[in-house]
């Protein structure tokens, strides 16, 4: 096949482009692989992450307080004194817990004056810059809104001020100025700071002691040239000051040198020349550099630490702030410092001349003793002239080793403390170096070449992503603890964590001088804690190396994006997102990320019908009705743009076409109430209704109600008296006569309940002489006559009782009767009639009548069991109107009826409703449902996700009292009288309580008014503008004076410089223990009763 020329040229160019791009990508991959290989072979020191260090660290914070820059250790009292912005704290050395907090803020007038001079509100605060524990006192100085002030306070109670003095020349005005101070064993304060508002007059100043106040020469840049003071130490006969300043002896450009300066502590100043000025001031350069043909100097001193046991001064040095970041630690012997000060001076004859070496007139200078004749009798004019012009040493102070102890590129060191550790074979100097990024480097200082510059670990005391320099760093050797001051907190970090290494390999691999493997106990411990020194193993021969193997981690998910998916013949759209295994990437054999890297959701889905439901019951029981069946488009439901189902979701058909309805059956109206069954004592009324056109009407045809509940009165009835009947007639005509009557009483309206009372008999005597008025005399005469004619008189006698009659009722207590006649014999010839009752009555059939069961009325239809998708109504009745007695017939028929409801389809996206929950105390029930859509569309999940309803009466919870159920019965007798008594009692008690509260408030107010006479209480003393004399007016205003060699600051105790606007208030907070009693329900007084309803 022949290819035309232009086409061949185009294909050739395309091939070359692909080849070049392939080669370029191959080179990039090879370069990346090579750099990663170099990273895996690089040796780095171990790093202790913030989360790993956190369990070992104690921290202290205080709301609204910042700049924890001054830390002072007080081991004898087991406390740490902390100076921050506007506050002083006493903390426990064990766990930095708060012992005391004292506010030390500037007054409102002082701050307002500061801001009027152009300073910001942030600058116009009281920043503590001097904090020294001296015996039983704490000496402290603060900037006090550019009006420095100092005070001495009790070391055990910071709120108690012993003495307050001027802070000028002892503390800087500006909190950003570096300063340092030390108190000697004689109680003299040596301060190195700037002593004017603008910060242009630096000085090393002595005060407060028995000697005269002295300072460096004022406005003489050869003595101090824009210095930054770093540290001050009281060593022997000298006071040493470490600083960095612009080098006056450097001829080309501006260069910063690090210096050490010293003065004799018994210096008394000059006479006529150098009056009130140091006569023993000297300074020398500190050399910290990498040796070589062209040395690399670390010129700027940042921190210094004195190790008195070894007569060593350790210093942290960095490069210039505008150059490449690099840091080093160098150590200097005090003998090397003395050697430099005993060497030649460097002197400049005039400003145009060079700085040249000049011999030391006193090569072995020592601070002499003060003669008895006077403090400056031995100072000659020549010696004062030499002291004025010869102060800069020609030779620099050389470090202990030619190379720095530790160096680090790309990092700036800021603080340093040193600990001496006795290992198994030698004594190690362990350096703890603070960095400007907020980490602490733990390093070894040793003469061994294999361990030179050896970093043991790097401690991350700040959480990831937070970078800030350390404000202060202190070490407590006895407790083996570091105390770190940050902008918002104080930390206590242990010097060693030997128990964190759980294996021998990890313990020995840490190369930590504190730690070794205890072979007897098989654990990592310190030398002091080892059980047997001979079995305690250490291996500090090389530096520890961090394991650079790193497992991969997923990065964040990308935003959701639309994507396509294929499912057989169907296709649709989805939302997709992805993440990469790059946070971090697996490195140096680390594991790949575990888990999905792609997430797919909300894929579109076409809807499909479910199967038809079964036909519902016919809508009518007779006559033409209809039946319904349904289906829903939820198998599956359409989602995220999928097609909806095509067709009907509901079908209907006729039913009962051939079942005509019978004549309507209905209840007729109720009839009138019947007469009450009893006139009293409780009866029953009834009324009836009839079921028209049938006998199957729902409900009851009879209703009953009680009537005439009042008790029946007892009715008594007496029978008439019988005629008088003679008894015991004598032959002489004397006799006794009797008559009878009976009493009946009926306590019930039922006549069968009548009871016969006692028979009552009356007797009278009729004498024979006729003196008595007896109506039966003729009858007696007849009897006598008949007796005389017929002597056989026959009295009547009862026949036997007849049988008992049948019971008057079949049940519920009837009665029966039996009778007898007076025929055995009948009374004749004037015989007496039978005495006694002719009839007897007896109770019978006391058992209850049998009861046949009958249905109660139907309850109302219940609520529908579902709001959609098909539910049911329900109603019930019970066989309790009346309930059947044992052995009798039960009710026939159904006790429950149900009907369909809510047959419409449910809204798309919702799950089924949950069951109704339990009733709350408010008498409500609730249920819920959830949306099953991940990203619901506009038509999905419409409606509420929860429903509530009033509880059925039978389910409303009743809150019972705490006492037992039996106790509640005692409240059943609660009536209106009890309610009135309770109300009156509550009113009286509330009145007494109100009176007591009012009297208590009046008493507290009087106490508060009395206390304000001594300590005025104001809402905010910084803004208090009361009408009386302010508290700050008790202090004498300060008259500002220019400080020069002829006008020095005398001792403040002579009151030469009264303080200006020292309106500094202190407020003390003591943390109180939490002794609040816990709430106990059983201690709640009273008892709640619920009367029976």
From Swiss-Prot:
Tell where it localizes.
Membrane
Biological process, per Gene Ontology: axon extension; detection of light stimulus involved in visual perception; neuron projection extension; neuron projection guidance
Residue ranges annotated as Extracellular topological domain: 20-978
Q: Which residues form the signal peptide?
A: 1-19
Residues forming the Sema domain are 45-495
Q: Which residues are glycosylated?
A: 59, 95, 157, 178, 287, 333, 378, 532, 539, 547, 602, 728, 944
Which segments does the topology annotation call Cytoplasmic?
Answer: 1000-1093
* Keywords of the record: Developmental protein, Differentiation, Disulfide bond, Glycoprotein, Membrane, Neurogenesis, Repeat, Signal, Transmembrane, Transmembrane helix
UniProt keyword Transmembrane, yes or no: yes
Q: Does the keyword Zinc apply?
A: no
Q: Which InterPro entries match?
A: Plexin_repeat, PSI, Semap_dom, Semap_dom_sf, Semaphorin, TSP1_rpt, TSP1_rpt_sf, WD40/YVTN_repeat-like_dom_sf
The UniProt GO MF terms for this protein read: semaphorin receptor binding
User: Which cysteine pairs are covalently linked by disulfides here?
Assistant: 114-124, 141-150, 264-367, 288-330, 618-655, 622-661, 633-645, 676-707, 680-712, 691-697, 807-844, 811-849, 822-834, 864-901, 868-906, 879-891
GO CC term, one of those recorded: membrane
Protein family: Belongs to the semaphorin family.
Name the job this protein performs: May act as a positive axonal guidance cue.
Q: What is this protein called?
A: Semaphorin-5B
Could you tell me the gene encoding this protein?
Sema5b
């Amino acid at each position: 096949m022949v290819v035309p020329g232009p086409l061949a040229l185009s294909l050739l160019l395309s091939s070359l482009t692909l080849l070049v791009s392939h080669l370029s990508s191959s080179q990039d991959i090879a370069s990346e692989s090579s750099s990663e290989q170099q990273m895996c072979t690089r040796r780095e020191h171990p790093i202790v992450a913030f989360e790993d260090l956190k369990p070992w660290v104690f921290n202290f914070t205080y709301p609204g307080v910042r700049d924890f820059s001054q830390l002072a250790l007080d081991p004898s009292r087991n406390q740490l004194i902390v100076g921050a912005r506007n506050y002083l704290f006493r903390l426990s050395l064990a766990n930095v817990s708060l012992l005391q907090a004292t506010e030390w803020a500037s007054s409102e007038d002082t701050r307002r004056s500061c801001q009027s001079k152009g300073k910001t509100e942030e600058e116009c605060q009281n920043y503590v810059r001097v904090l020294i524990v001296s015996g039983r006192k704490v000496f402290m100085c603060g900037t006090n809104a550019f009006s420095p002030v100092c005070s001495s306070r009790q070391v055990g109670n910071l709120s108690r001020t012993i003495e307050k003095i001027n802070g000028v020349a002892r503390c800087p005005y500006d909190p950003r100025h570096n300063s340092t101070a030390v108190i000697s064993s004689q109680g003299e304060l040596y301060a190195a700071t700037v002593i004017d508002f603008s910060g242009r007059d630096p000085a090393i100043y002595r005060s407060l002691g028995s000697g005269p106040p002295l300072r460096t020469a004022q406005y003489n840049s050869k003595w101090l040239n824009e210095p930054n003071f770093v540290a001050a130490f009281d060593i022997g006969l000298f006071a040493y000051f470490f600083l960095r300043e612009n080098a006056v002896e450097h001829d080309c450009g501006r260069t910063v040198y690090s210096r050490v300066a010293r003065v004799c502590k018994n210096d008394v100043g000059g006479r006529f020349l150098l009056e009130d000025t140091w006569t023993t001031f000297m300074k020398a350069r500190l050399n910290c550099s990498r040796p070589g043909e062209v040395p690399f100097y670390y010129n700027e001193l940042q921190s210094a630490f004195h190790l008195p046991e070894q007569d060593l001064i350790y210093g942290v040095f960095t490069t210039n702030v505008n150059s490449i970041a690099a840091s080093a630690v160098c150590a200097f012997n005090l003998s090397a410092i003395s050697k430099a000060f005993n060497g030649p001076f460097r002197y400049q004859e005039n400003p145009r001349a060079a700085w040249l070496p000049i011999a030391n007139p006193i090569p072995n200078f020592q601070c002499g003793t003060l003669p008895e004749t006077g403090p400056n009798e031995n100072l000659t004019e020549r010696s004062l002239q030499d002291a004025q012009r010869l102060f800069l040493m020609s030779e620099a102070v050389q470090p202990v080793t030619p190379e720095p102890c530790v160096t680090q590129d790309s990092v700036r060191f800021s603080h340093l403390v040193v600990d001496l550790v006795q290992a198994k074979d030698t004594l190690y100097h362990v350096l703890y170096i603070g960095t400007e990024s907020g980490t602490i480097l733990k390093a070894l200082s040793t003469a061994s070449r294999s361990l030179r510059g050896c970093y043991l670990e790097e401690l991350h005391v700040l959480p990831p992503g937070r970078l800030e320099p350390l404000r202060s760093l202190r070490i407590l050797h006895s407790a083996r603890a570091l105390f770190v001051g940050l902008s918002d907190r104080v930390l206590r970090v242990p010097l060693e964590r030997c128990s964190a290494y759980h294996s021998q390999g990890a313990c020995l691999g840490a190369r930590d001088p504190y730690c070794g493997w205890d072979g007897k106990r098989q654990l990592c411990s310190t030398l002091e804690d080892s059980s047997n020194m001979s079995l305690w193993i250490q291996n500090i021969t090389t530096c520890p190396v961090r394991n650079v193997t790193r497992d991969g981690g997923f990065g964040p998910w990308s935003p959701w994006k639309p994507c396509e998916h294929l499912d057989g013949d169907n296709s649709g759209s989805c939302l997709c997102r992805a993440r990469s295994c790059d946070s971090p990437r697996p490195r140096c054999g680390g594991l790949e990320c575990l888990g999905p890297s792609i997430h797919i959701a909300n894929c579109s889905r076409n809807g499909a019908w479910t199967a038809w439901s079964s036909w519902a019951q016919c809508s009518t029981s007779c006559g033409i009705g209809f039946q319904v069946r349904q289906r829903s488009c939820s198998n599956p439901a359409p989602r995220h743009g999928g097609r909806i189902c095509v067709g009907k979701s509901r079908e209907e058909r006729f039913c009962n076409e051939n079942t005509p309805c019978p004549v309507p059956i209905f209840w007729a109206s109720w009839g009138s109430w019947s007469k009450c069954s009893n006139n009293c004592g409780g009866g029953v009324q009834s009324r009836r209704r009839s079921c028209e056109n049938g006998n199957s009407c729902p409900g009851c045809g009879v209703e009953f109600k009680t009537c005439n509940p009042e008790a029946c009165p007892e009715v008594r009835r007496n029978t008439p008296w019988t005629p008088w009947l003679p008894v015991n007639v004598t032959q002489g005509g004397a006799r006794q006569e009797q008559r009878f009557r009976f009493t009946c009483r009926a306590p019930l309206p039922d006549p069968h309940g009548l009871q016969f009372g006692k028979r009552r008999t009356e007797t009278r005597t009729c004498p024979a002489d006729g003196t008595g008025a007896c109506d039966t005399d003729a009858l007696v005469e007849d009897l006598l006559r008949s007796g005389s004619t017929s002597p056989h008189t026959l009295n009547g006698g009862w026949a036997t009782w007849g049988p008992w009659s049948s019971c008057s009722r079949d049940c519920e207590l009837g009665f029966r009767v039996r009778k007898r006649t007076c025929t055995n014999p009948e009374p004749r010839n004037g015989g007496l009639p039978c005495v006694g009752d002719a009839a007897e009555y007896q109770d019978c059939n006391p058992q209850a009548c049998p009861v046949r069961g009958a249905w109660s009325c139907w309850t109302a239809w219940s609520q529908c069991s579902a709001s959609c998708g098909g539910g049911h109504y329900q109603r019930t009745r019970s066989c309790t109107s009346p309930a059947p007695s044992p052995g009798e017939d039960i009710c026939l028929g159904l006790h429950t009826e149900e009907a369909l409801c809510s047959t419409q389809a449910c809204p798309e996206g919702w799950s089924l409703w949950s069951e109704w929950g339990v009733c709350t105390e408010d008498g409500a029930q609730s249920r819920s449902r959830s949306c099953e859509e991940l990203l619901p569309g506009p038509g999905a999940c419409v409606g509420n996700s929860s429903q509530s309803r009033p509880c059925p009466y039978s389910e409303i919870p009743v809150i019972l009292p705490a006492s037992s159920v039996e106790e509640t019965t005692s409240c059943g007798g609660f009536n209106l009288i009890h309610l009135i008594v309770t109300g009156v009692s509550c009113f009286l008690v509330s009145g007494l309580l109100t009176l007591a509260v009012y009297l208590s408030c009046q008493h507290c107010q009087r106490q508060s008014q009395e206390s304000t006479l001594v300590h005025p209480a104001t809402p905010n003393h910084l803004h208090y503008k009361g009408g009386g004399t302010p508290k700050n007016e008790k202090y004498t205003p300060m008259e500002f004076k220019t400080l020069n060699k002829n006008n020095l600051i005398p001792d403040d105790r002579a009151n030469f410089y009264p303080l200006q606007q020292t309106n500094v208030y202190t407020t003390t907070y003591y943390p109180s223990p939490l002794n609040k009693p816990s709430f106990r329900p059983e201690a709640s007084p009273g008892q709640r009763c619920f009367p029976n309803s």
